[in-house]
Swiss-Prot record:
GO molecular function terms attached to this record: amino acid binding; aspartate carbamoyltransferase activity
UniProt pathway annotation: Pyrimidine metabolism; UMP biosynthesis via de novo pathway; (S)-dihydroorotate from bicarbonate: step 2/3
Residues spanning the signal sequence: none
Physiological role: Catalyzes the condensation of carbamoyl phosphate and aspartate to form carbamoyl aspartate and inorganic phosphate, the committed step in the de novo pyrimidine nucleotide biosynthesis pathway.
Organism expressing this protein natively: Oceanobacillus iheyensis (strain DSM 14371 / CIP 107618 / JCM 11309 / KCTC 3954 / HTE831)
Catalytic reaction equation(s): carbamoyl phosphate + L-aspartate = N-carbamoyl-L-aspartate + phosphate + H(+)
Protein name: Aspartate carbamoyltransferase catalytic subunit
InterPro entries, A to Z: Asp/Orn_carbamoyltranf_P-bd (IPR006132), Asp/Orn_carbamoylTrfase (IPR006130), Asp/Orn_carbamoylTrfase_sf (IPR036901), Asp_carbamoyltransf (IPR002082), Asp_carbamoyltransf_Asp/Orn-bd (IPR006131)
Family designation: Belongs to the aspartate/ornithine carbamoyltransferase superfamily. ATCase family.
Residues annotated to bind carbamoyl phosphate: 48-49, 98, 128, 131, 250-251
Sites where the protein binds L-aspartate: 76, 161, 211
One of the GO BP terms on file: 'de novo' pyrimidine nucleobase biosynthetic process
Gene Ontology terms: cellular component: cytosol
Length: 309
């Protein structure tokens, strides 16, 4: 594995290996017995992804080299590649990068030779592989397998990196992917069937809602009647199958794609997804560092629990 940029890099058995490792880490956390440094380079706002990577790194015993774009040499015209090489030069063992560009990885690769692994924490509208794997873990915990599930992804498909990553991975694992989107929010470059929300509700084993990505629209989308036409209302929620679960990558626009009272409903696994994100990212970091030969099995020790004084 060169850098971890896309879920398409992983075979089905590797995906299951990572989500099973993440599941194991919830109960039996590991720590690394050697000093490692992570450079977290976030060029877009982030709450869940940035914080869960930070917690994952700390749980593994990794030192975090934090980065603030507004106080960095990027303001002086430094390239992404030179910034990454700087982190490598001062001792970072791996980088976690989120960037608004769809092509930032190409910029890194064309810049020269980077000798440490990069983990994609979200690339423009293209991919969000770590979010995808935590979503897969959440489904795996619920159903024991991904194969055969009908997963409806509903919302702003056109601008969603989550939709793309999940659709690819779910298909590889044998699930049936169905999209549902308001007019103008479809992405017809992705070859999946579309249903209306009312049709999709009755099909779904998993209903994954997406917010409208206003920051990627040229003009602000009108949302006053979005919930009633395309979102999850209380009436639609009642039509979900008994075993169906509700997911959302967040941030959530309450009252737009979902009725606010449904965010923590019985079927909702939204906050469980967030919790799973820490352990999936721990597993991904371990997987990537192992692939690069940076860590080995003998570098893992059982994490000591902290005793309150």
């Amino acid at each position: 594995m060169r850098h971890f940029i896309s879920v398409n890099q992983l075979e089905a058995d590797e995906m299951y290996q990572i989500i099973r490792k993440a599941n194991e880490l919830r109960d039996r956390p590991n720590q690394l017995n050697r000093q490692l440094f992570a450079g977290n380079l976030f060029f877009e706002p982030s709450t869940r992804t940035k914080m869960s990577f930070s917690v994952a790194e700390r749980k593994l015993g990794v030192e975090i080299l934090d980065f603030h774009t507004e106080a960095s040499s990027l303001a002086k015209g430094e390239s992404l590649y030179d910034t990454a090489k700087t982190f490598e030069a001062i001792g970072a063992n791996f980088l976690v990068i989120r960037h608004p560009s769809d092509q930032w990885i190409s910029e890194l690769e064309q810049g020269g030779k980077l000798n440490i692994p990069v983990i994609n924490a979200g690339s423009g509208k293209e991919e969000h592989p770590t979010q995808c794997l935590l979503d897969l873990l959440t489904m795996y915990q619920e159903f024991g397998s991904i194969k055969g599930l009908k997963v409806v992804i509903a919302g702003d498909i056109k601008h969603s990196r989550v939709a793309k990553s999940n659709a690819m991975a779910l298909t590889k694992l044998g699930a049936k992917v169905i999209f549902s989107a308001a007019p103008g929010f479809e992405d017809h470059t992705l070859d999946y069937p579309y249903l209306t929300m009312d049709e999709a509700i009755e099909e779904a084993d998993v209903l994954m809602l997406l917010r409208i990505q206003h920051e990627r629209h040229l003009h602000k989308a009108e949302t006053s009647d979005y919930l009633s036409l395309y979102g999850l209302t209380k009436e639609r929620y009642k039509k979900l199958q008994d075993h169906a679960i509700l997911m959302h990558p967040a941030p959530i626009n309450r009252g737009v794609e979902i009725d606010t009272n449904l965010v923590e409903s019985e079927k909702s696994r939204i906050f469980k997804q967030m919790s799973n994100g820490v352990y999936v990212r721990m597993a991904i970091i371990m997987h990537v560092l192992s692939e690069w030969g940076i860590i080995h099995e003998n570098n893992l020790i059982k994490r000591k629990s902290l005793t309150a004084i």
